[in-house]
Amino acid sequence: MNSLTIIFLLSGLTAYHAVLADGTGSSESVTAGDSGVVVLVMIGALLTLLMTIPIIGLFGIYVRTRASIEEMRGILMQIHLRLITGDQRSNRGDVELGAGASLLTISSQPPSYAEALLMEPVEPQQQEGVPLEAEIRV
């Protein structure tokens, strides 16, 4: 017998008579029609539970992907507007863009990912124990 049959025997939901440990049979039994309904309800509940988990997971992936696409679209639109207007300031507004930005041409197409990386200013990193002014000698 499988575990589902054992559960039904113990719960009294099948038409089988449960045999007790002392060998006597129990007088309690339920018709087979009732057990069929119970089985269908249990299978339906199990399938519903199993289907909600992947649906919730897929919805979460969709929401995260959608947010990432919208964020990237906003960043590309800012870069595109900067190219059109000739604005060469970074997001902080006071740092001029590096020499790589002057190589870009103004076009009606949004810049590629590589061009967008060229537009970001690279700030010098201070090495431990060395003053920043000593590193930037020109």
Swiss-Prot record:
Give the UniProt entry's GO cellular component terms. membrane
Q: Which cysteines does the record link by disulfide bonds?
A: none
Give me the segments passing through the membrane. 4-20, 37-53
| Topology of this chain in the membrane | Multi-pass membrane protein
Q: Give the UniProt keywords, A-Z.
A: Membrane, Transmembrane, Transmembrane helix
Q: Where in the cell is it found?
A: Membrane
**UniProt key word Transmembrane helix:** yes
Q: Does the keyword Membrane apply?
A: yes
Principal localisation: membrane
Q: What is this protein called?
A: Putative membrane protein ORF6
* Native organism: Ictalurid herpesvirus 1 (strain Auburn)
